[in-house]
Each structure stands twice: as structure tokens, then as C-alpha cells.
């Protein structure tokens, strides 16, 4: 949550500063006043990080929902060797900045702010209801004055003008209709010319729907109360409303009255105590802080009709920039966290919830013979996670391709640094390093591979989000992410279709991945476990099975429950047995 709030503030700030720049340029060099509605773009920018990017579910051909059993014949694999490597857990705890506590604190603060501001909003709304209820209808003489002032304007039915005894300054608000309230004393004590200015000014607020937009913006400011800039923008909207209402008055009076109108504003602001403390209405006297700007705008007023093309261009340009920068801030959010491409093969839905039990995750298997996928929890299988130690499959292949290691010599000497597992504290070759998931072995390979080479290979393989980050242990709960479905697709394509890597390198890699071998099948695979700040949060088992009649690529991922590589391997074997892939156990 904290990350989303930060991204929202940054996104909001970027568009806010951009609009300020546009306003400055247009005002200084073109005497053009941007409409206050452009500030809605800042709200949209602030909300984008919270909008879940959802695409329609991909439809596959010939989808079958029946639970399958894969046919298995008892032909001999022509192997007389029985091999079983024990399941072991070799995972280290990764210490990262703990966002959980920050998330909890920021969420609590946000909720408190929302409650406080919601109460303030409700209180303001109830006060408007009170003002409406205690307002009085105008008498005939007062109606005639209003009709004379607004003679050249279409008096809309949704605009109501009334008087009130309890207010000191004219105000305009929306409560089902646009209501303009004039202090009762004004019809007696204020000269007709000054009353005309006041009525025109308040009528402009109602005509432009300023008060309705003020309510809408206040609602958004409650939702985005975590962002201090939203309150600055709200003040700017109120200021823009007043300036726009002043322009409306100037357009409806003679030029020789401009000075008198300015004096009326000064007299009202300086001599009448500031009345309007309601956040949902506009008051004629306004705040003293706005007086200088209003007077300058009256003096420099450009009363020519302003082109809407400039406004449209700025809105479109800003919107495009907003989309681009939001994707940058979200770290390629569309591609980082979900695999979106449709499968062009048949696939079959599985129900393996009983085997998964309390574990949350997914299972994907591909049959080479049938050219068909078998998927449990398709939605989850498209979510991307850190590959952790399953990425060592690719580091090994890259190391073989770059001749950092080879089939004749894949040994690396131990640097005598003490590691958490005894199996790591010795000389390693590819087989032992893969079996014991020795971090230092594969980190040493990675350190000798240029970043541009890795980036090229990941692009060719279409490996997950291809994000190498700082290029330091990027596969261990860091920038690189891949989905369970992609694990199967990428691994299968690399071993079966990729011509860049030699057959010799593929055979050596396979040898290091061998787990079980008997007369019925050969099981190859690699586990992966993600532990962050002592918490297990990611478990993988990726591999393939060779039987007498077929070859199957598979991957199991666990995201909750008991998410470890060891548990993922146990679940995988149960599913493969149930489906008949590991027949004859």
C-alpha cells in the first residue's frame, strides 16, 4: 500500500507541475487563462496506480474441463540404473526493507484522515441543508431587481436566488439545485450598481457549476487525503473559480465600471469579516490572500473569447504524458506482474485443489506428444513471481554457452567463506551445485556474464519480465519475475526449439537436473524457495519427465500456505502420479 501511495503522489505531482508550467507560459506569453477543469487530470494521475489493469480472459481452442489421466505404457526405457536424489532445502533468507510495517502505518493514517475529512464533509453538507431551510423567498421588489440585473441572461430553473438573515456575505452552493443566498440587508443597504456586481458574480458560479465541481473535488480529496498536494490543487480551483466569475462580471459591465467593481471587491474583502468557512460553497468576499490576484486579473483581463483548441491540445498532451509516466512509475506494471499472451495450443483445466490443500498456487504441464497444456488455477499461473533458484537452470546454460564452465571442467573452488549449509562449503561442479542449489557457484557464473548478453538471451527466450535491475542477484526476490505458465513455455522452448544453445550443453544441463531415474521414467527438475525477512513466500518446482511414450514439461508454484521448493516438489510428484505420468511407482 505504501508503495502505491508514493507512486500516486509522484504521479500527481508530475502532472501538477506540468499544468503549472502550461499555465505560466500561456498566461505570460498569450494572456490565456486555462480552465480550472484541467485540474481533474491531476486526480486521474493520482488514481492510476490504484486502477487494476484487467484484460479479458483469453479464450483457448478446444478447452476441456474433464480431469485427465495420461496414458502410460510399461515399455522399458532401456535404462538399468535406478537413481533417486533426496529432497533437500537449500534456501537463504533475504533481508529486504520491510514494507509491511510501513504499509500498516500508512493504511491506518489514511483511514483516520478519510474519517476526519468525511466528518468535515458531512458537517459542511448539513450546514448547507440548514442554510437552504432557513433561507427566505424574495419579495416582489427584490425579484424585480434580480430580473433587471439578469435580464440578458437565461435564468435557468436549476438556479435559485434567495435571501438569508444569518449570513454576512453572499454565497453560492449546490444542494440539489444551485442556490445563491444574499444577505437580507444587502437589498436595503447596498447600492444597486454594487448589488448588480454581486448578483452577476454569484450567478457565474452557479452558471459554471463551480459549486458542484467543488463538491466532486472534495470527495476526491477525501479519497486522496494521503496526498498533501491535493489540498493545494483544491485551493487553486477555488481561486480559479473566483477569477472566472470576475471575468464573467467584466464581460457584462461597461469598461468604465471595472474600477468600481474592483473597489466593490476590496470593500467586501477588507470590511466584511470572512464569513464562508464552508468547504462546499463560494463566498463573494473571499479570502484576503486571493484579493491581490483578483485585482490584477481585473486590471489585465483578456475578455476575448478563448480558443478551446488550446485547452483540448493541452488535455490530450497531458493525458498521453500521464499514461507514459504512470507506467514508468509502476515499474512496467502491465508486464511485470502478469503474463498476458494467449496460448495458441489446446489446454485442459485441472482440479487439483485437494492435492494443494491449504497451499495457494498453480500447476502447469505440457505434453510434447499431444501438444497440449494441462493447467490448474489458470489465473494464478499467469501471475509473475521471482524465479529464485529455478533461474539457476538458465545461469547454468548461459555459463555453458559462454564457456565459463564446460562438460569436461565445471569445477569451481570454494573460497573458504563459511556458508549456512555444509554442502556449500566445498569445491563444486555443475551437478553438485545444482543438486545443492549452491548460491555462490551460480553467482560466480553470473558475475562473468556481461549484462548485455543476459539481456539478449532473456529477450530471445522471452523470459518473464526480462528485468535485470541492478544485475546483482536479480533472480532472488528482486527485479526478475516470471509466471508459472511461462516457466513451462520458456523451459520447453529452450530445450526443444532453441538452436542457439548446443545439444551438448543441453545434455549437460539435463544431467545436472536429474532427480529420479528408473525403467518407467526419468524425472528432471529444480526447486526454488523465496524467504524474505524470515518468511517463506515463494516456492517453485520446475522440470520435465521422460517416459516411454511422451515427454512432459511441468512447473508448480506456491504463493501461500507452505510456499517452499520442497513442498512444491512433493505436490508436483503427487499430481504427476495421479495423472499417470509417474506410472509404476
Swiss-Prot record:
Residues 1-4, 49-104, 329-585 are extracellular. The chain crosses the membrane at residues 5-22, 32-48, 105-122, 312-328. The keyword Cell membrane applies. CDD domains: M56_BlaR1_MecR1_like (cd07341). It is found in: Cell membrane. Carboxylation occurs on two lysine residues. Carboxylation at 'Lys-392' activates the active site serine residue for acylation. On acylation, the lysine side chain experiences a spontaneous decarboxylation that entraps the sensor in its activated state. The active site is at residue 389. Integral membrane protein involved in sensing of the presence of beta-lactam antibiotics and transduction of the information to the cytoplasm. Mechanistically, activation of the signal transducer involves acylation of a serine in the C-terminal sensor domain upon binding of the beta-lactam antibiotic. In turn, a conformational change occurs and the signal is transmitted from the cell surface to the cytoplasm. This is Regulatory protein BlaR1. It comes from Staphylococcus aureus.
Amino acid at each position: 500500500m505504501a508503495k502505491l501511495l508514493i507512486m500516486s503522489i509522484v504521479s500527481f505531482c508530475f502532472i501538477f507541475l506540468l499544468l503549472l508550467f502550461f499555465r505560466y507560459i500561456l498566461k505570460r506569453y498569450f494572456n490565456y487563462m486555462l480552465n480550472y477543469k484541467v485540474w481533474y487530470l491531476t486526480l486521474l494521475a493520482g488514481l492510476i496506480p490504484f486502477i487494476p489493469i484487467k484484460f479479458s480472459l483469453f479464450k483457448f481452442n478446444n478447452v476441456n474441463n474433464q480431469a485427465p489421466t495420461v496414458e502410460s505404457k510399461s515399455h522399458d526405457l532401456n535404462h538399468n540404473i535406478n537413481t533417486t536424489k533426496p529432497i533437500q532445502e537449500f534456501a537463504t533468507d533475504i533481508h529486504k526493507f520491510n514494507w509491511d510495517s510501513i504499509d500498516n502505518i500508512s493504511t491506518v493514517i489514511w483511514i483516520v484522515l478519510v474519517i476526519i475529512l468525511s466528518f468535515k464533509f458531512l458537517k459542511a453538507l448539513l450546514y448547507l441543508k440548514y442554510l437552504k431551510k432557513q433561507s427566505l423567498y424574495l419579495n416582489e421588489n427584490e425579484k424585480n431587481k434580480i430580473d433587471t440585473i439578469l435580464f440578458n441572461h437565461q435564468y435557468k430553473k436549476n438556479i435559485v436566488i434567495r435571501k438569508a438573515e444569518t449570513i454576512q456575505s453572499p454565497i453560492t452552493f449546490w444542494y440539489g439545485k444551485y442556490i445563491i443566498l444574499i444577505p437580507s440587508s444587502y437589498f436595503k443597504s447596498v447600492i444597486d450598481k454594487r448589488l448588480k456586481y454581486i448578483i452577476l458574480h454569484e450567478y457565474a458560479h452557479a452558471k459554471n457549476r463551480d459549486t458542484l465541481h467543488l463538491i466532486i473535488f472534495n470527495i476526491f480529496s477525501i479519497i486522496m487525503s494521503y496526498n498533501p498536494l491535493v489540498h493545494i490543487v483544491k485551493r487553486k480551483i477555488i481561486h480559479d473559480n473566483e477569477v472566472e466569475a470576475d471575468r464573467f462580471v467584466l464581460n457584462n459591465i461597461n469598461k468604465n465600471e471595472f474600477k468600481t467593481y474592483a473597489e466593490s471587491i476590496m470593500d467586501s474583502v477588507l470590511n466584511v469579516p470572512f464569513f464562508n468557512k464552508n468547504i462546499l460553497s463560494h463566498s463573494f468576499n473571499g479570502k484576503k490572500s486571493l484579493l491581490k490576484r483578483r485585482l490584477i486579473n481585473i486590471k489585465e483581463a483578456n475578455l476575448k473569447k478563448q480558443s478551446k483548441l488550446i485547452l483540448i491540445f493541452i488535455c490530450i498532451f497531458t493525458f498521453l504524458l500521464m499514461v507514459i509516466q504512470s507506467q514508468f512509475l509502476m515499474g512496467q506494471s502491465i508486464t511485470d506482474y502478469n503474463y498476458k499472451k494467449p496460448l495458441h495450443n489446446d489446454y485442459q483445466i485441472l482440479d487439483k485443489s485437494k492435492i494443494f490443500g491449504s497451499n495457494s498456487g498453480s500447476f502447469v504441464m505440457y505434453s510434447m506428444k499431444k501438444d497440449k497444456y494441462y493447467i490448474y488455477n489458470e489465473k494464478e499461473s499467469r501471475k509473475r513471481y521471482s524465479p529464485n533458484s529455478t533461474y539457476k537452470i538458465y545461469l547454468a546454460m548461459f555459463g555453458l554457452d559462454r564457456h565459463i564452465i564446460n562438460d569436461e571442467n565445471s569445477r569451481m573452488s570454494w573460497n573458504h567463506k563459511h556458508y549456512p549449509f555444509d554442502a556449500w562449503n566445498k569445491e563444486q561442479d555443475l551437478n553438485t551445485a545444482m543438486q545443492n542449489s549452491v548460491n555462490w557457484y551460480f553467482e560466480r557464473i553470473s558475475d562473468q556474464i556481461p549484462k548485455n548478453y543476459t539481456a539478449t538471451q532473456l529477450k530471445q527466450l522471452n523470459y518473464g519480465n526480462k528485468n535485470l535491475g541492478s544485475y546483482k542477484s536479480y533472480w532472488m526476490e528482486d527485479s526478475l519475475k516470471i509466471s508459472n505458465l511461462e516457466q513451462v513455455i520458456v523451459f520447453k522452448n529452450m530445450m526443444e526449439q532453441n538452436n542457439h544453445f548446443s545439444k551438448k550443453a543441453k545434455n549437460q544441463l539435463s544431467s545436472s537436473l536429474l532427480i529420479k531415474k528408473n525403467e518407467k521414467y526419468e524425472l528432471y527438475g529444480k526447486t526454488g524457495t523465496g524467504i524474505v525477512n524470515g518468511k517463506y513466500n515463494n516456492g517453485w518446482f520446475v522440470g520435465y519427465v521422460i517416459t516411454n511414450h511422451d515427454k512432459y514439461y511441468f512447473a508448480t508454484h506456491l504463493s501461500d500456505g507452505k510456499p517452499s521448493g520442497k513442498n512444491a516438489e512433493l505436490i508436483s510428484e503427487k499430481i504427476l502420479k495421479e495423472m499417470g505420468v509417474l506410472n509404476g511407482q
